[in-house]
């Protein structure tokens, strides 16, 4: 049943009732699997240029960047990180308090290797009054996971992947956003050292992306001798997907239709 409030929400998003019905029908029917003949390999679909060919392609690209053409590195950066932490969310809600599954055990055994370890350690001290080793020694594993995922801590469970610390280096850790700035400097700078990078982001996270760029871009510009021109755009709300319950009825949050933004319908089906 579509209410007047629903109609107003759909109109604001630019989504028709027919589109909602189509999405629900797709959920019900499911999506056929592709029939794969083989894994991609050098013999099947992957090109492996030899040394001479590599030089030719690299020279061609280098020559192109030295023209007056505008090169823009385009980065879709709206993907949510919540699915990455599915197992940790399950542990947080489990009726046991110590790691039981192989995933849970490995997570805590290797926790110091994560790029976000230092930040998480600080978050644990702030939210639980102890650092990670002390919490683990006391058997308080869930406090560590809560500090990673929840808003009182790092809030990684609600952030897009582009803002999470992913890679660890001797001089610190980098988020994917930072890695794209570095990549842009290495292969997308024009003859004047200008690097154009465009990120698509979700509206609710745009300010966080902007803040991270403001914090980090100048240092990378200095390190690589480039000048960044960084821009953002937001995906249209008309591309949002309706959320459905286990009976394939539109899901409501406090009476309001819930939509999954920036996600394919097939992904939504798996989440259900």
Functional labels for PLM-detected ranges:
Residues 201-208, 232-246:
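Short, conserved secondary-structure transition motifs
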Residues 124-173, 177, 249-259, 270:
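Active-site cores of enzymes that catalyze phosphoryl transfer or operate on phosphate-rich substrates
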Residues 95, 173-191, 215-219:
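Histidine-anchored nucleotide/phosphate-binding helix
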Residues 1-44, 160-171, 190-201:
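Low-complexity, highly charged intrinsically disordered N-terminal segments
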Residues 263-269:
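Residue-level detector of conserved catalytic or cofactor/ligand-binding positions
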Residues 87-94, 212-218, 245-251:
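Short secondary-structure boundary/capping segments
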Residues 71-87:
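A phosphate-binding catalytic loop at a beta-strand-loop-alpha-helix junction
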Residues 20-38, 93, 97-140:
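Extended, charge-enriched "interface" segments that sit outside catalytic cores
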């Amino acid at each position: 049943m579509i209410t007047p409030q629903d109609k107003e929400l759909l109109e604001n998003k630019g989504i028709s009732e027919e589109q909602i019905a189509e999405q629900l029908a797709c959920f019900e029917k499911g999506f056929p699997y592709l029939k794969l003949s083989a894994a991609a390999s050098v013999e099947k679909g992957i090109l492996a240029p030899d040394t001479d060919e590599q030089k030719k392609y690299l020279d061609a690209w280098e020559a192109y960047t030295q023209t007056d053409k505008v090169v823009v590195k385009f980065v879709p950066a709206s993907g949510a990180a919540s699915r990455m932490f599915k197992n940790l969310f399950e542990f947080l809600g489990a009726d046991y308090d110590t790691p039981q599954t192989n995933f849970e055990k490995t997570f805590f055994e290797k926790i110091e290797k994560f790029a976000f370890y230092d930040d998480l350690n600080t978050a644990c001290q702030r939210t639980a009054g102890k650092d990670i080793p002390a919490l683990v020694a006391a058997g308080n594993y869930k406090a560590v996971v809560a500090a990673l995922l929840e808003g009182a801590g790092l809030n990684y469970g609600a952030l897009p992947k582009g803002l999470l610390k992913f890679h660890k280096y001797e001089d610190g850790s980098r988020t994917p956003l930072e890695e794209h700035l570095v990549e842009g400097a290495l292969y997308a700078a024009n003859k004047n050292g200008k690097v154009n990078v465009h990120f698509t982001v979700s509206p609710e996270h745009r300010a966080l992306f902007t803040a991270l760029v403001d914090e980090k871009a100048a240092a990378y510009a200095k390190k690589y001798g480039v000048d960044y021109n960084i821009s953002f755009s937001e995906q249209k709300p008309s591309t949002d997907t309706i959320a459905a319950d286990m009976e394939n009825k539109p899901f409501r949050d406090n009476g309001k239709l819930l939509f999954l933004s920036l996600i394919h319908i097939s992904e939504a089906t798996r989440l259900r």
